[in-house]
Amino acid sequence: MIDKLQAIEDRYVELSQKISDPNIISNVNEWRKYVKEHAAIEDIVLKYREYKKVLEDIEATKELLSSNDEELKEMAEEELSQLEEKKEKLLEEIKILLIPKDPNDEKNVIMEIRAGAGGEEAALFAHDLFRMYSMYAEKKGWKVEIMSSNETDIGGFKEVILNISGKGSYSRLKYESGVHRVQRVPTTEAGGRIHTSTATVAVLPEVEEVDVEINPNDIKVDVFRSGGHGGQSVNTTDSAVRVTHIPTGIVVTCQDERSQIQNRERALKILRAKLYEMALQEQQREIAETRKSQVGTGERSERIRTYNYPQGRVTDHRIGLTLYRLQEVLDGDLDEIIDALILNDQAEKLKNMNLN
């Protein structure tokens, strides 16, 4: 690992010279490329330099252990213990920094929440999840925009698609993809029996047009009138848009905006995210087959979390984490769960890295 760190530091020094070179500065594209690479490895280099300084301090302190002055010797032993502890802590921090970054972590999010098994109760649970993520986003200072929704008559969601934008949104919310299960007594249940319902959450990175190119010949666009609850007409013009991607069969419908142009733009944005995710999943499948190891399968069919109302309990099945503060979680207090998922993800990735 030390050889790898030294190579990174050497590259950092080289890049520092390049981004100060007037000949390179005059070529904006080349200069930006070097600045980006320089910034990407800066944290590793600074932490490695701190680690090397601690090693020097350890060697200097060890020399004091041979002193005849007992008081000085005792102080040196205490300092050495602290330095060894600091060295181990820095090593762990460096290992985390060496984990390859997810290129999508800086992207915004397109989140799809769909009612699963459980009929109207599942739709109400989908609305609860929508509220939970909206409140979490608010706590984080992220912006939430409903791109498309299909509401039920009693306030649930058959489906709702959100655009969540803000620093770190995808890097934290990506762990929410999967099947969420709720266990509770529905308001419509006269006998007081506990029902189990599900909703699925898909978290996609929002992608730019440059990331995914859509051939205009590959899409079919249909326009129709927006419908309210029970199919009632809420718009007298054909403003709703349905976009079909012919090669994959993906269909996206948007009708929340009054303008056909806005609905079309939103539908294409969602389609781009879906196509990007398909390409990403295919790439990850190939990597998994090659390496014969997987860091979580990410399959949507997996039940990832249970929300148990009678017990006031939330359990994340992927990491065996159980919290008895259901209401706080539903009010958007998700950091404890997400932080634990991130740590677990980092630990799994470190296992698969050769840092010797």
Swiss-Prot record:
PROSITE patterns cross-referenced by the UniProt entry: RF_PROK_I (PS00745)
| One Pfam short name | RF-1
Q: Which SUPFAM superfamilies match?
A: Release factor
Q: Which residues carry this modification: N5-methylglutamine?
A: Q232
InterPro entries per UniProt: PCRF, Pep_chain_release_fac_I, Pep_chain_release_fac_I_sf, Prokaryotic/Mito_RF, RF-1
Which Gene Ontology terms of cellular component type are present? cytoplasm
Keyword Methyltransferase, does the record have it?
no
Q: Provide the protein's localization.
A: Cytoplasm
Query: Which UniProt keyword terms apply here?
Result: Cytoplasm, Methylation, Protein biosynthesis
Tell me where the transmembrane regions lie: none
Q: Which GO terms describe its molecular function?
A: translation release factor activity, codon specific
* Keyword Cell wall biogenesis/degradation among UniProt keywords: no
| Post-translational modifications | Methylated by PrmC. Methylation increases the termination efficiency of RF1.
Entry-linked SMART domains: PCRF
Functionally, this protein is described as follows: Peptide chain release factor 1 directs the termination of translation in response to the peptide chain termination codons UAG and UAA.
Q: Report the family membership.
A: Belongs to the prokaryotic/mitochondrial release factor family.
Q: Which HAMAP family match?
A: Rel_fac_1
Specify the protein name: Peptide chain release factor 1
Could you tell me which species this protein originates from? Thermoanaerobacter sp. (strain X514)
Q: What gene is this protein translated from? A: prfA
